[in-house]
Amino acid sequence: MSVTIEDIIKDLELEVINKGKNVNEINVSDINRPGLQFSGFYNYYANERVQIVGKAEWSFLDAMQPDLRKKRLEKYFEFDNPGTIVTRGLIPHKEFLESAIKNKRWILRTNNISTRFINRLMNYLDVKLAPETRLHGVLMDVYGIGILITGESGIGKSETALELIKRGHRLVADDAVDVKQIDGVLNGTSPYITSGMIEVRGMGIIDISALYGLSSVLKTKNIGLVICLEQWKKDENYDRLGIDKEYMDILNVPVRKLKIPIRPGRNLAVIIEAAAANYRYSLVSDVTPVDVISERIQELRKEDGGDE
């Protein structure tokens, strides 16, 4: 993924003071404040980043003699960069504009103060530049846990999601889930076209927000647990104690995965609710039901006079 300065102008509503010749792709979410460059130091200059000129940099330039300021700015604008953004609505110096126009560099402006704008810009770039993929499944918010329900087509993922929605949980995406990895966290959302919709075989497409209210649909959710629905296999050795832990790799992030075999009479919605509650409990406690059972066995052995 990449972003251009024109994307930033549009999405962050920036004022264009001077239009540059090149529209360079931005591939990093970090920014640079060119105070050192204005002083003439160009070692380790990160000119591939968006440049931010705030009150400190502006005041530094303002304190210079015009001839020196012109010299320093001509040197600065000789280097190509995606664009320079002036914050606080500051008016660029005459030498600043002349050098930018001469070298055909992008100069933009925002009325935001530097700190707030930098946070906003870096968050924007983090999202835009994050690694992403599209997965087949249903993403639900169950008890505050983002659960990705996977399984082969026709196994009942959407029907299970519909039952969960009836029980008060929220839909994020059905059938196609767009996933981005931001700082090791997987964030899932729905493609725009299918947002708020569920496809149920035999009924067609259902508008969840229209039938169950806007609160039944969530725009985005971090993925904490993957539940894979599969047909019951007689010879499969399913985990009965919760000791064996399996993970699914999504964009190089391991996510806890549970296999739920489907069999007549099993209430999948209730099982998924229990899985979500159990996962949430595991985040705050290291004690598992197996630990509790082991302690009880030890207690019974002691009562019977055995300590082994």
Curated annotation (Swiss-Prot):
**So where does Mg(2+) get bound?**
158, 199
Biological role stated in the UniProt entry: Catalyzes the ATP- as well as the pyrophosphate-dependent phosphorylation of a specific serine residue in HPr, a phosphocarrier protein of the phosphoenolpyruvate-dependent sugar phosphotransferase system (PTS). HprK/P also catalyzes the pyrophosphate-producing, inorganic phosphate-dependent dephosphorylation (phosphorolysis) of seryl-phosphorylated HPr (P-Ser-HPr).
Active site at: 136, 157, 175, 240
Segment Important for the catalytic mechanism of both phosphorylation and dephosphorylation: which positions? 198-207
Keywords (A to Z) from UniProt = ATP-binding, Carbohydrate metabolism, Kinase, Magnesium, Metal-binding, Multifunctional enzyme, Nucleotide-binding, Serine/threonine-protein kinase, Transferase
Task: Mention one GO biological process in which this protein takes part, according to its record.
Answer: regulation of carbohydrate metabolic process
Q: Catalysed reaction(s)?
A: [HPr protein]-L-serine + ATP = [HPr protein]-O-phospho-L-serine + ADP + H(+); [HPr protein]-O-phospho-L-serine + phosphate + H(+) = [HPr protein]-L-serine + diphosphate
Extract the ranges annotated as region (Important for the catalytic mechanism of dephosphorylation).
261-266
Write the protein's name: HPr kinase/phosphorylase
A Gene Ontology MF term for this entry?
magnesium ion binding
Top enzyme class, one word, equals transferase
Origin, by domain of life? Bacteria
Q: What is known of its domains?
A: The Walker A ATP-binding motif also binds Pi and PPi.
Q: How does it assemble?
A: Homohexamer.
